[in-house]
Amino acid sequence: MTTSVCLLGASGSVGESTLKVLRAYPEKFRLHSFSVHSNLEKAKEIQKEFSPDFICVSSDFADVGVLGNKLGRTQILYGESSLCELVREPEVEIVITAIVGSVGLRPTIAAITAGKRLGIANKETLVTSGPLIQSLIAKHNTKVVPVDSEHNALFQLLESLNPNSVEKIILTASGGAFRDLPVEQLSSVTKEQALHHPTWNMGPKITIDSNGMINKGLEVIEAHFLFNVPYDKIGVVIHPQSIAHGIVELKDGASFLYASYPDMIFPIAHSLFHPEPVPKVLRSYPAKDWGKLEFREPDFKRYPGLGLAFEAGKVGGTAPCIFNAANEAAVELFLKDEIRFIEIPDYIRKTLDEIKIEFPLSLEEYEEADRIARETVRNLKARKVVSAC
């Protein structure tokens, strides 16, 4: 008996890694459905190989004529609203949310309320509306297993430890492409440089986030909500080798770390198989091959966005939502060559300063905070407030 999987974001890096895992275990999992944003050629390739029941093309600007309404036995859906339809399909048992950005919020909620097992790779969902998501997970008794490598590592460690013994959780970070660049040279970083990452092959938005360690800031906020750990018990260390993915410090002074080859197939396979063990070796990486492992504190002058994430998380309410939306809007401006790399955290800071923090109860209130934050970034750009600083 195979388990039916719905994969949201099949054409991205996490989506491609998920497909690798499905290929490795055809007797265990079946791709029931998947989504792409606008990569129709990729959609056709995946459909030909996996023959799913449904495909969702979420972009409102997709050329419907390329795929039509049916491809072989596969039904084609269009638009962001169809993402929710996809995850609610009765046959779907596991939903992997690999969509980048706050667009993943509503389909994630749909999966939770429909009682699906959730492999969550869309960190923005918990960042933007953590308290709401927490309450829905508890209400619907939803099983959630994180897919991000760091959170999955911590999940596995914490599951095996007595919670009363835990002192602190540590997220590791490569430090990005500019970890050794003199700080004064960050002002001249180009888009081409910022789109390169030393460890992971990711999409443009996540690569930009990672090179400024804003991605790690988002992960700090996500870890707070996933594991119910206060911010003063969450740490970040630079680990250039990207072999240790998570560390748990114990009250007695000992530490446990989770190590593997830096490949997303490990956390994805764990998420799909949980609570059962993954039955075969995915990629052996014995300790004798690790070489030297380095760990160091992050420099918040080099990575101001990381510090802003901790601040926003501690404030709570809509502050993390504003942080995320302002970052998405600023990264979009950077990718259009309208602002500099080092100005991204400045736009986030200014946006947080300009918007009143609320403590909402509904999804619509969080979405309104998201909208206002994006609009504020555009207004700041038009007024040249940040550039003038």
Swiss-Prot record:
<feature type="binding site">
    <location>
        <position position="13"/>
    </location>
    <ligand>
        <name>NADPH</name>
    </ligand>
</feature>
<dbReference type="InterPro" id="IPR036291">
    <property type="entry name" value="NAD(P)-bd_dom_sf"/>
</dbReference>
<feature type="binding site">
    <location>
        <position position="150"/>
    </location>
    <ligand>
        <name>Mn(2+)</name>
    </ligand>
</feature>
<dbReference type="GO" id="GO:0070402">
    <property type="term" value="F:NADPH binding"/>
</dbReference>
<dbReference type="GO" id="GO:0030145">
    <property type="term" value="F:manganese ion binding"/>
</dbReference>
<protein>
    <recommendedName>
        <fullName>1-deoxy-D-xylulose 5-phosphate reductoisomerase</fullName>
        <ecNumber>1.1.1.267</ecNumber>
    </recommendedName>
</protein>
<feature type="binding site">
    <location>
        <position position="11"/>
    </location>
    <ligand>
        <name>NADPH</name>
    </ligand>
</feature>
<keyword id="KW-0414">Isoprene biosynthesis</keyword>
<feature type="binding site">
    <location>
        <position position="148"/>
    </location>
    <ligand>
        <name>Mn(2+)</name>
    </ligand>
</feature>
<feature type="binding site">
    <location>
        <position position="210"/>
    </location>
    <ligand>
        <name>1-deoxy-D-xylulose 5-phosphate</name>
    </ligand>
</feature>
<comment type="similarity">
    <text>Belongs to the DXR family.</text>
</comment>
<feature type="binding site">
    <location>
        <position position="203"/>
    </location>
    <ligand>
        <name>NADPH</name>
    </ligand>
</feature>
<keyword id="KW-0464">Manganese</keyword>
<keyword id="KW-0479">Metal-binding</keyword>
<feature type="binding site">
    <location>
        <position position="14"/>
    </location>
    <ligand>
        <name>NADPH</name>
    </ligand>
</feature>
<feature type="binding site">
    <location>
        <position position="39"/>
    </location>
    <ligand>
        <name>NADPH</name>
    </ligand>
</feature>
<dbReference type="InterPro" id="IPR013512">
    <property type="entry name" value="DXP_reductoisomerase_N"/>
</dbReference>
<keyword id="KW-0560">Oxidoreductase</keyword>
<feature type="binding site">
    <location>
        <position position="215"/>
    </location>
    <ligand>
        <name>1-deoxy-D-xylulose 5-phosphate</name>
    </ligand>
</feature>
<dbReference type="Pfam" id="PF13288">
    <property type="entry name" value="DXPR_C"/>
</dbReference>
<feature type="binding site">
    <location>
        <position position="219"/>
    </location>
    <ligand>
        <name>Mn(2+)</name>
    </ligand>
</feature>
<feature type="binding site">
    <location>
        <position position="174"/>
    </location>
    <ligand>
        <name>1-deoxy-D-xylulose 5-phosphate</name>
    </ligand>
</feature>
<feature type="binding site">
    <location>
        <position position="216"/>
    </location>
    <ligand>
        <name>1-deoxy-D-xylulose 5-phosphate</name>
    </ligand>
</feature>
<dbReference type="InterPro" id="IPR013644">
    <property type="entry name" value="DXP_reductoisomerase_C"/>
</dbReference>
<comment type="pathway">
    <text>Isoprenoid biosynthesis; isopentenyl diphosphate biosynthesis via DXP pathway; isopentenyl diphosphate from 1-deoxy-D-xylulose 5-phosphate: step 1/6.</text>
</comment>
<dbReference type="InterPro" id="IPR036169">
    <property type="entry name" value="DXPR_C_sf"/>
</dbReference>
<keyword id="KW-0521">NADP</keyword>
<feature type="binding site">
    <location>
        <position position="150"/>
    </location>
    <ligand>
        <name>1-deoxy-D-xylulose 5-phosphate</name>
    </ligand>
</feature>
<comment type="function">
    <text>Catalyzes the NADPH-dependent rearrangement and reduction of 1-deoxy-D-xylulose-5-phosphate (DXP) to 2-C-methyl-D-erythritol 4-phosphate (MEP).</text>
</comment>
<feature type="binding site">
    <location>
        <position position="124"/>
    </location>
    <ligand>
        <name>NADPH</name>
    </ligand>
</feature>
<dbReference type="Pfam" id="PF08436">
    <property type="entry name" value="DXP_redisom_C"/>
</dbReference>
<dbReference type="InterPro" id="IPR026877">
    <property type="entry name" value="DXPR_C"/>
</dbReference>
<feature type="binding site">
    <location>
        <position position="149"/>
    </location>
    <ligand>
        <name>1-deoxy-D-xylulose 5-phosphate</name>
    </ligand>
</feature>
<feature type="binding site">
    <location>
        <position position="197"/>
    </location>
    <ligand>
        <name>1-deoxy-D-xylulose 5-phosphate</name>
    </ligand>
</feature>
<dbReference type="InterPro" id="IPR003821">
    <property type="entry name" value="DXP_reductoisomerase"/>
</dbReference>
<dbReference type="Pfam" id="PF02670">
    <property type="entry name" value="DXP_reductoisom"/>
</dbReference>
<feature type="binding site">
    <location>
        <position position="219"/>
    </location>
    <ligand>
        <name>1-deoxy-D-xylulose 5-phosphate</name>
    </ligand>
</feature>
<dbReference type="GO" id="GO:0030604">
    <property type="term" value="F:1-deoxy-D-xylulose-5-phosphate reductoisomerase activity"/>
</dbReference>
<dbReference type="GO" id="GO:0051484">
    <property type="term" value="P:isopentenyl diphosphate biosynthetic process, methylerythritol 4-phosphate pathway involved in terpenoid biosynthetic process"/>
</dbReference>
<feature type="binding site">
    <location>
        <position position="122"/>
    </location>
    <ligand>
        <name>NADPH</name>
    </ligand>
</feature>
<feature type="binding site">
    <location>
        <position position="123"/>
    </location>
    <ligand>
        <name>1-deoxy-D-xylulose 5-phosphate</name>
    </ligand>
</feature>
<feature type="binding site">
    <location>
        <position position="12"/>
    </location>
    <ligand>
        <name>NADPH</name>
    </ligand>
</feature>
